[in-house]
Design a protein with these regions (language model features):
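Alpha-helical recognition segments enriched in aromatics with Gly/Pro capping
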Residues: 1-194
Length: 194
């Protein structure tokens, strides 16, 4: 498995990805500002109508805390909308990163290691300077998105998928896959034997 883009989480906030996602969610009625109870002052997404979350005692997910801090799940929703090409500005243009060349690389065969520093393939990184255009084909706008993330993120990834669905993009939600992996703990003795 290889990849061609390193994204900087800070760019999601600096470039207004979350702000735009927030506006889309708010305007669609997918989130609400709590005015009482334990979540007072928080922006929450209600999951009560989703069969996926039907058995939960508290099916509300906080996306913005009362102090204004955006949660990881909120940022993940914005990032997922970008990955799917659904983070669109009011003028119809896609909200996007700036891009900067990071490294070139090559790989002789799928099972061979990647060699950085030479080769024809490019590894780019995001930047908050949107004047720096994508080198080659644009990123984002995928038909399917596979998020390879630790199994401990299963619940937030379900929330991300549901956010895409409640915005009216059922096909995109169905094509949003959390490809989870488990963590392995090795004893020092086991590590020495490896």
């Amino acid at each position: 498995i290889t990849y061609d883009l390193l994204t900087h989480e800070s760019d999601i906030l600096h470039l207004g990805f979350w702000q735009r996602a927030f506006e889309i969610l708010r305007d669609a009625g997918a989130i609400r500002l709590e005015d009482d109870g334990k979540n007072i002052g928080c922006w929450v997404m209600s999951l009560a109508d989703s069969p996926e979350f039907a058995d939960m005692d508290d099916p509300d997910k906080i996306l913005v805390r009362s102090n204004g801090t955006v949660t990881y799940t909120g940022k993940d929703i914005a990032y997922q909308l970008w990955k799917l090409g659904l983070l669109v500005d009011p003028d119809g243009s896609r909200h996007d990163f700036g891009y900067r060349r990071f490294a070139s690389w090559e790989q002789e065969a799928p099972a061979e290691p990647v060699t950085y520093g030479s080769g024809s393939r490019l590894l780019a990184r995001t930047t908050s300077n949107t004047d720096e255009a994508a080198p080659g084909e644009p990123y984002g706008g995928g038909r399917s998105v596979y998020n390879v993330i630790d199994v401990r993120q299963a619940y937030p990834q379900k929330v991300v998928k549901e956010a895409v669905r409640v915005l009216g993009h059922s096909d995109a939600a169905d094509n949003s896959v959390h490809f989870s992996y488990e963590m392995v703990a090795l004893t020092p003795g086991a590590v020495r034997e490896i």
